């Protein structure tokens, strides 16, 4: 009887472990806003800083210049910075280079350098196979030229 109880306990723990793993993998904390995926890491990073990243991105994808500028100027650190770069790359594809250029034309050299770094990270480490491993000047030549200091 003791052995049966022990086997049932182990079986229950294994099942619970499998269920938890599957549940966590299926219910990741990422979100999709107007076709752009925002990673859980980026959501947590911005939420902890009181930034409504989804709202800013939602408005930016509709072409709002102020929201585009606000999104581009966010300072995102560590791993979330790579994800932010991926979001920027996807945003450029949705709204087009002209809207991005209008948003950045009033920025200073330091800001432009920061944006360049995010975009390059998004191109190198992003999850979009159409732009992965491409150079900024090849995929977005007009944005590249407007980001030069």
What are these regions (language model features)?
Residues 25-149:
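Non-catalytic all-alpha helical scaffold/repeat segments
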Residues 6, 19, 70:
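Functionally constrained cores in energy, signaling, and assembly domains
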Residues 14-24:
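Hydrophobic alpha-helical membrane-insertion segments, chiefly the h-region
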